Amino acid sequence: MPAPRAQEAVTVSVFAQRFSATRRGARLARRLATHRLDLWDLPYGSPASDTVTLVVAELAANAVLHGRVPGRDFEVRLTYDRTAGLVRVEVSDTHPGHPELSDAAVRPSADADGGRGLLVVEAVADRWGVAGRTGPGKTVWAECAVRVPDGPRPVRA
């Protein structure tokens, strides 16, 4: 009988969830993303968690406010590559309109209630963009470099 081989460490983790295209859905997306990051050893209140959570909050809010199609949900997908020290955030909706990358360069007036979501994402993410998806709509994505925790991952019960 061959000797047992050691299991390779999991270096990529994925979280994906669909949410109702409502403000409540956007809040829930942000909260669940923060919880998932904590489970991935990017703890609450850490710079990595705060940055990724902010990106999720802005992209989810945009999906609800600008990408909402009645009766359709939006999806959030987080991919954490521990080896690369990178979290990729993807928010997909079914609205056919695509934000222009140049939209982030248009500054809203100081007293405007909104219009800063992509500016915030551009400021805190290392890269971001828009991609098509299977079916109607688009995926707005952002990548955030994160500090990889030192030492072995703690075992959670």
Segment roles from a protein language model:
Residues 61:
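Short alpha-helix lining the ATP-binding pocket of the histidine-kinase-like ATPase
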